[in-house]
């Protein structure tokens, strides 16, 4: 917007022209107006609200981080609304979280908090927590040292760090599908090329790798146990085969093992257990066993990789919360975490069986599923032709039931991720009956 001339302003406000000139010089110095030689003086556009909004929208289009799928955005918005039934939610219900153990661990942490430095932490994480993770990994057949462990703010944060600090731009990621990683844009932000391998065809990895043999920058991403969303696990033979592929083609493996501690029968070894050449980068987390808000996970890798990631980390966020790390350490040290796990496995197995019983009664003629031996999820695949997107919106808008449709995980099947971990048995039963009713209508 152009402002009037000095003479017009002096007449309008009944002041001397010198006053107008000084005022304009001051406003120009502050950036509120600007002068075009031979044209006049103008108000800066950034004071215009519509211009600001349009400019921000334009700048967001330049972002290297893509927006989530619309369905995922909607799920993320509603997931914290307690008025909905969250039959697909990927976290523990409040009653399953170790409240008493957490309180005790926090109290123990607080008792020596004056000895704690509240300065910036290093990129590696709390030494005592790293050491106790090393001990626990050793009991699983993974022999590493403190220098091989880095604490992160959860598993997804670990994957983000690896994407930035290890893989680099334009990498090829060979990953199992369906996978929760498809509901994020963690690999897409650096223009990674995503090659999907169906979880039930994991032995096809070798053939797929051969197609990209000339591409140097590539990695395998795999969830070996209780895959999110299907609940499936690899056999020990499949794990060994993946290691063989990795060694043959000199390709690193990113092993996302966040459900490792939630097993309902004898635990199986991780892929890292078979790793003799340091090809496997192992990721895990306490978010699925303690609480998401604790935001503590870890990476196990070669010393050189950990050193590189720690340096990148210091450029981004200076490390995870030292208080959260100390609380988790206290739970591990006093064994309350392991006692909690025993109870958690028992309760989750019971809730899984409750859900499976209802599925057998209602869905056996119209859908199929597998029995997970751990984790949170049952993968419901419909035998009939049904519009899953329509079902999602109908249940959301009319019944306040939130489901996670399979397509957000890269599945082409007519599928839903069901969770027995978050809701009460009463709500699980109610939600499944409503889903059945709407499916029959469709």
UniProtKB/Swiss-Prot annotation:
The keyword Nuclease does not apply. Keywords: Activator, Aminotransferase, DNA-binding, Pyridoxal phosphate, Repressor, Transcription, Transcription regulation, Transferase. Gene3D superfamilies: Aspartate Aminotransferase, domain 1, Type I PLP-dependent aspartate aminotransferase-like (Major domain), Winged helix-like DNA-binding domain superfamily/Winged helix DNA-binding domain. It holds the Pfam family GntR. Residues 2-46 form the HTH gntR-type domain. Induction: Down-regulated by MgrA. The modification N6-(pyridoxal phosphate)lysine is found at residue 288. Residues 6-25 bind DNA. PANTHER family: AMINOTRANSFERASE, KYNURENINE_ALPHA-AMINOADIPATE AMINOTRANSFERASE, MITOCHONDRIAL. In the C-terminal section; belongs to the class-I pyridoxal-phosphate-dependent aminotransferase family. This is HTH-type transcriptional regulator NorG. It comes from Staphylococcus aureus (strain NCTC 8325 / PS 47). The lineage of its organism: Bacteria, Bacillati, Bacillota, Bacilli, Bacillales. The gene is norG.
């Amino acid at each position: 917007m152009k402002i009037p001339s000095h003479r017009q302003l002096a007449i309008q406000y009944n002041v001397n022209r010198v006053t107008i000139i000084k005022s304009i010089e001051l406003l120009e110095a502050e950036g509120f107006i600007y002068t075009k030689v031979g044209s006049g003086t103008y108000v800066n556009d950034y004071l215009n609200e519509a211009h600001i909004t349009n400019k921000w929208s334009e700048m967001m289009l330049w972002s290297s981080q893509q927006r989530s799928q619309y369905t995922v955005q909607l799920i993320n918005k509603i997931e914290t609304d307690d008025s909905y039934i969250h039959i697909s939610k990927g976290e523990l219900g409040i009653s399953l979280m170790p409240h008493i153990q957490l309180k005790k661990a926090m109290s123990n942490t607080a008792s020596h908090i004056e000895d704690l430095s509240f300065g910036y932490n290093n990129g590696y994480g709390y030494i005592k927590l790293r050491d106790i993770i090393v001990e626990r990994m050793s009991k699983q057949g993974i022999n590493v040292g403190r220098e091989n462990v880095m604490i992160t703010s959860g598993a997804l944060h670990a994957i983000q760090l690896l994407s930035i600090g290890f893989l680099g731009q334009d990498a090829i990621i060979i990953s199992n599908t369906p996978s929760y990683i498809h509901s994020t844009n963690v690999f897409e932000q650096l223009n990674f090329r995503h090659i999907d391998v169906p979880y039930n065809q994991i032995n096809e990895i070798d053939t797929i790798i051969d197609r990209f043999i000339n591409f140097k920058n590539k990695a395998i991403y795999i969830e070996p146990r209780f895959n999110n969303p299907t609940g499936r696990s690899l056999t020990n033979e499949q794990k060994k085969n993946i290691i063989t592929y990795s060694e043959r083609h000199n390709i690193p493996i990113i092993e996302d093992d966040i459900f490792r501690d939630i097993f309902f029968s004898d635990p199986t070894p991780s892929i890292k257990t078979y790793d003799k050449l340091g090809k496997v980068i192992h990721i895990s987390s306490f978010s699925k066993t303690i609480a998401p808000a604790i935001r503590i996970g870890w990476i196990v890798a070669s010393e050189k990789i950990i050193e590189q990631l720690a340096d990148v980390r210091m450029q981004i966020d200076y490390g995870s919360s030292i208080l959260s790390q100390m609380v988790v350490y206290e739970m591990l040290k006093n064994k309350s975490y392991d006692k909690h796990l025993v109870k958690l496995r028992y309760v989750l197995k019971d809730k899984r069986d409750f859900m499976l019983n209802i599925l057998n009664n209602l869905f056996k003629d119209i859908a199929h599923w597998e029995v997970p031996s751990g984790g949170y999820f049952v993968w419901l695949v419909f035998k009939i032709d049904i519009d899953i997107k329509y079902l999602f919106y109908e249940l959301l808008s009319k019944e306040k039931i939130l489901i996670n449709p399979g397509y957000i995980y890269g599945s082409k099947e007519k599928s839903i991720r069901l969770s027995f971990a978050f809701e009460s048995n009463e709500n699980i039963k109610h939600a499944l009956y409503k889903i059945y009713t709407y499916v029959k209508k469709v």
